[in-house]
Amino acid sequence: MIEVILDTETTGLSAEKDRIVEIACVELSNHIPTKNIFHTFLNPEIKVSADAFSVHGYSDEFLSNKPKFKDVAKDFLNFIKDKKLIIHNADFDLGFLNNELKRLNIKPILKSDILDTLQIARSKFPGVGNSLDALCKRFKISIEAREKHSALLDCHLLSKVYIELIDKKELTLDLMSNDKIFNEKMKLSNENREGVVVKVSPEQMEEYKKFLKKNVSNAFALD
């Protein structure tokens, strides 16, 4: 079974007025991350709100030379085609994605194509916090690296949370052995972010670390 973990970062909270600044997709095969990753930063063509910047740390200057959504839409849609999407708080991401697609006169992503891990968590743990951070703490998944939000890092965390939510704990060892591979693929160079399936070298990882240290206050550890 092939699925895709998906997450976005945005300029703000309004799907109507704000835009996407980062999309990350991680392919799963039988619930375990594969080597196929789609990741891109985007020029939103509007300013990032102060609140959003405090969450993810992506400045207007950093995003100014990134591709626009229209430039990566085809590759993005090809990556997720015919795959179940695993999203935490899917209404948020879906609202932004479908508004971007609407601007290009492309049909929307259907809710029937999505599994919302927030809804699963609420049904299993009613009346308590079920944010990604809360679930990671509940399942003893380290969030030490998550001082700032990153769509790609959050996909990695959600892949672990997902295993716990669907009671597939026997896959935990597979996830642990997969961490090294995933970590090598999640650090992208500042030059290689054009919305393609990414295959990342160790040298590119180091470049991404340098970018974070330079551009993001209290940049999260990537090792």
Where in this protein do the model-derived segments appear?
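Acidic, Mg2+-coordinating catalytic module of metal-dependent nucleases/exonucleases
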Residues: 84-87, 96, 100, 131-188
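Acidic two-metal-ion nuclease catalytic site recognized across multiple nuclease folds
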Residues: 164-223
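Conserved non-catalytic scaffold segment of RNase H-like nuclease domains
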Residues: 1-112, 122, 132-149, 222
